[in-house]
């Protein structure tokens, strides 16, 4: 009789498979983003992925780690994907290269690689770019229905690498919509316009012509929501973080909107604009930098939702998912310390 050695149960969900599933779940949101904002997002993702693989491979070589085995876990590709779709589609090529290098080399490998980083690498790269180059990082094109000039793949490629389309237009000219007015994202438009207009007048602007929220952005968020639900269905992520994130953000927005509807954005605008769904299902749920206990995940997600609302309303940036996630990452050791489940046979309590 042959006796097998342990382990006697096996989990087929390897890191490589989970990372690949998360990448595939991003596809609905990427399709929507490409349709409404052009091919630039796809180009940014490809540049980020190439940079991430080269950077991670070089660092692993320097650390004398097995290069191919580490690269095949798909974690570098996922970091690159999240950063690539977070940047404006026509941002200069050197920005995505710089941000990806910072995310992989500094925010991930400097801490020891996958499983050791205390902060979400993609969001570290994003915040570094946002603080360093705020103008370029807020230069989003108008959504397709409002575009004054259609930007195809070739023009997107030219603009990313040279700054101009084949007809000589730069990013600032491309931002001008069909009505001759320079466009911004719904959250940015709402936040800026509140200084001089009440909310009901702001919502008459064409950018807010969507069924749920801003034109284009509502479908991008819906796409990432669909992908996030797929991850929940496949049990690739826990439900605690996205649910508590969205409930906290929606709750804060609902209370403020009911108290002063002329001064605050509606819950739907908060939930279906910016990077809300991407953040809730794909960024905040990073298993390395997020809380690891069930109660801790609820607290962690709710904290991010509250921070997103606070920074959007009172901070200097119209969208704030990256800042909120990184700030919440700082609290993870404390949250995990006080939310560890009691071990059977031991009394609860902390010394």
Curated annotation (Swiss-Prot):
Keyword Transport: yes
GO cellular component, one term: plasma membrane
Enzyme class per UniProt: translocase
UniProt topology in membrane: Multi-pass membrane protein
Protein keywords: Cell inner membrane, Cell membrane, Electron transport, Flavoprotein, FMN, Membrane, Phosphoprotein, Translocase, Transmembrane, Transmembrane helix, Transport
Pfam family, one: NQR2_RnfD_RnfE
GO terms under biological process: electron transport chain; transmembrane transport
Cofactor(s) named in the record: FMN
Subcellular location per the Swiss-Prot or TrEMBL entry: Cell inner membrane
Residues spanning the membrane: 18-38, 40-60, 87-107, 121-141, 211-231, 241-261, 264-284, 298-318, 321-341
Function: Part of a membrane-bound complex that couples electron transfer with translocation of ions across the membrane.
Subunit description: The complex is composed of six subunits: RnfA, RnfB, RnfC, RnfD, RnfE and RnfG.
Protein's name in the database: Ion-translocating oxidoreductase complex subunit D
Species per Swiss-Prot/TrEMBL record: Yersinia pestis
């Amino acid at each position: 009789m042959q006796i097998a050695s342990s382990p006697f149960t096996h989990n087929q969900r390897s890191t490589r498979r989970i990372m690949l599933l998360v990448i595939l779940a991003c596809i609905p949101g990427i399709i929507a983003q490409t349709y409404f904002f052009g091919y630039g997002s796809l180009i940014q993702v490809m540049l980020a992925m190439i940079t991430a693989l080269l950077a991670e491979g070089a660092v692993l070589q320097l650390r004398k780690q097995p290069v191919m085995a580490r690269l095949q876990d798909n974690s570098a590709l996922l970091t690159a994907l999240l950063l690539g779709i977070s940047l404006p589609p026509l941002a200069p090529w050197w920005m995505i290269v710089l941000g990806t290098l910072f995310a992989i080399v500094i925010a991930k490998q400097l801490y020891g690689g996958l499983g050791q980083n205390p902060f979400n690498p993609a969001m570290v790269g994003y915040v570094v770019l946002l603080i360093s180059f705020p103008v370029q990082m807020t230069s989003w094109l108008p959504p397709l229905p409002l575009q004054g000039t259609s930007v195809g793949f070739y023009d997107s490629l030219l603009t990313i690498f040279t700054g101009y389309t084949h007809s000589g237009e730069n990013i600032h000219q491309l931002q001008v919509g069909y009505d001759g007015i320079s466009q911004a994202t719904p959250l940015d438009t709402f936040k800026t316009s509140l200084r001089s207009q009440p909310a009901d007048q702001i919502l008459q602007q064409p950018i807010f012509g969507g069924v749920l929220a801003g034109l284009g952005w509502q479908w991008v968020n819906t796409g990432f929501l669909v992908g996030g639900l797929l991850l929940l269905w496949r049990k690739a992520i826990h439900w605690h973080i996205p649910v508590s994130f969205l409930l906290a953000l929606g709750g804060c927005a609902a209370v403020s909107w009911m108290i002063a509807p002329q001064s605050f954005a509606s819950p739907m605008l908060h939930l279906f604009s910016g990077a809300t769904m991407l953040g809730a299902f794909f960024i905040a749920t990073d298993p390395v930098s997020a809380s690891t206990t069930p109660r801790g995940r609820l607290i962690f997600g709710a904290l991010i939702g509250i921070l997103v609302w606070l920074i959007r309303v009172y901070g200097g940036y119209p969208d704030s998912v990256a800042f909120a996630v990184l700030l919440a990452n700082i609290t993870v050791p404390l949250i995990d310390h006080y939310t560890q489940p009691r071990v059977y046979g031991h009394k609860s309590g902390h010394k």
